[in-house]
From Swiss-Prot:
Ranges where the MRG domain occurs: 117-288
Gene Ontology, cellular component aspect: NuA4 histone acetyltransferase complex; nucleolus; nucleoplasm; nucleosome; plasma membrane
Subunit structure: Component of the NuA4 histone acetyltransferase complex which contains the catalytic subunit KAT5/TIP60 and the subunits EP400, TRRAP/PAF400, BRD8/SMAP, EPC1, DMAP1/DNMAP1, RUVBL1/TIP49, RUVBL2, ING3, actin, ACTL6A/BAF53A, MORF4L1/MRG15, MORF4L2/MRGX, MRGBP, YEATS4/GAS41 and VPS72/YL1. The NuA4 complex interacts with MYC and the adenovirus E1A protein. MORF4L1 may also participate in the formation of NuA4 related complexes which lack the KAT5/TIP60 catalytic subunit, but which include the SWI/SNF related protein SRCAP.
Protein keywords: Chromatin regulator, DNA damage, DNA repair, Growth regulation, Nucleus, Phosphoprotein, Transcription, Transcription regulation
DNA repair in keyword set: yes
Localization terms from the record: Nucleus
Bias type Polar residues, positions: 1-15
Phosphoserine: residues bearing it: 71
Location of region: Disordered: 1-115
InterPro entries to which the protein is assigned, alphabetical: MRG, MRG_C_sf, MRG_dom
Function: Component of the NuA4 histone acetyltransferase complex which is involved in transcriptional activation of select genes principally by acetylation of nucleosomal histone H4 and H2A. This modification may both alter nucleosome - DNA interactions and promote interaction of the modified histones with other proteins which positively regulate transcription. This complex may be required for the activation of transcriptional programs associated with oncogene and proto-oncogene mediated growth induction, tumor suppressor mediated growth arrest and replicative senescence, apoptosis, and DNA repair.
Designated name of the protein: Mortality factor 4-like protein 2
Lineage: superkingdom: Eukaryota
Amino acid sequence: MSSRKQASQTRGQQSAEEDNFKKPTRSNMQRSKMRGAASGKKSAGSQPKNLDPALPGRWGGRSAENPPSGSVRKTRKNKQKAPGNGDGGSTSEVPQPPRKKRARADPTVESEEAFKSRMEVKVKIPEELKPWLVEDWDLVTRQKQLFQLPAKKNVDAILEEYANCKKSQGNVDNKEYAVNEVVGGIKEYFNVMLGTQLLYKFERPQYAEILLAHPDAPMSQIYGAPHLLRLFVRIGAMLAYTPLDEKSLALLLGYLHDFLKYLAKNSASLFTASDYKVASADYHRKAL
């Protein structure tokens, strides 16, 4: 009887130790289920009837310094790591799980694969507009000409005309919401990115003059079509940092491509070399 009791106690102790060893895996699975449920709630709200309820604050934010947490990609990464906590068969390895748990304590850190996949967001420029991008570059960097500011038709006016054009094609509330979100987002991106990413070096003294002359005006009220087109060469890299899932991002890209088609269709009136002028000798000295 004594030997049976000891054997029973030994088996109970081994079972308890084994359960303790596997607890990190079970708890991690519980967390993964909770994250999966949260992700499901988010995707459930993403309906194609409008731009997407998952795009608050104009496409869900733009800061590269604040990567989204709790994304689908990161949940998968955690699930892949979880089985490692239960590998091995010796109870002497019990202290190891806490070390592994601390290694992944920051849920906001993206995997290298997830980061690279986000860098692949590309906005396709219509073939009709590519020659103008080249001419714009040549006029400014080689011929040393400047786009005349304020523009005859500024970015705000172009976006407003596009919105009116789309709304006139069908008075659907969801469609109107989508157009307003797209136009508002393009305008915000333009105003944020112009001074740091959309200007050639030769244009910077002109930009400084504009800031002095119009300190309270958004740049979308000053600049025109050429600089707006430059935005779409750069915007893909910025979209890589938005917390949008693949479905929402694909929907957004569809709207951006539709706007680019509008620019291409109206390129004859929006893009012309006569809107540039040769910079003065005094300006050349400033630009050196």
